[in-house]
């Protein structure tokens, strides 16, 4: 009986943990910008992606492998910013669960103003994805337009964690 009770408690805890991993908060540009600034002296890797973007989906397993390698470093954080529509939030949640995304995922619900906020992230960004931006102390230190290899991602992280 004790074993059964322990098993049930373990299953409940695992289910609760998995539910926490699949929450997606929607934000506007200003909230995302504030979040970037609040990360302080961490190296913040911000990847813009969508579930409908084939190159984005292709690079995510490498991003998760690298995130898992660095996630215990208190000077590192990765955020995946989904550009899917708010009405597709459930699809994003299912995608996170199916792909076992371990980084924090945020849904940027500000598509109508994208011509305003895209140049605030990078003046040369034309809006295509995937895009990965690296920040340290709230300042942009690297911009990568397009798919990023695992090797380039790790190299960029290591260069800026020094």
Feature locations, PLM:
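Structural microenvironment flanking redox-active thiols in thiol-disulfide oxidoreductases
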Residues: 61-99, 113-118
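Loop/turn elements at helix/coil->beta-strand transitions in domains of secreted/extracellular proteins
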Residues: 39-44, 74-77, 101-104
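Short pre-active-site segment immediately N-terminal to redox-active cysteine/selenocysteine motifs
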Residues: 42-44, 49-52, 85, 128
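Conserved redox-active cysteine motifs that mediate thiol-disulfide chemistry
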Residues: 48-62
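Bacterial Sec-dependent N-terminal signal peptides
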Residues: 1-25, 162
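Thiol-/selenol-based redox modules, centered on thioredoxin-like
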Residues: 129-162
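Short, internal strand/loop/helix patches
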Residues: 96-129
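A short beta-strand-turn-helix
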Residues: 23-43
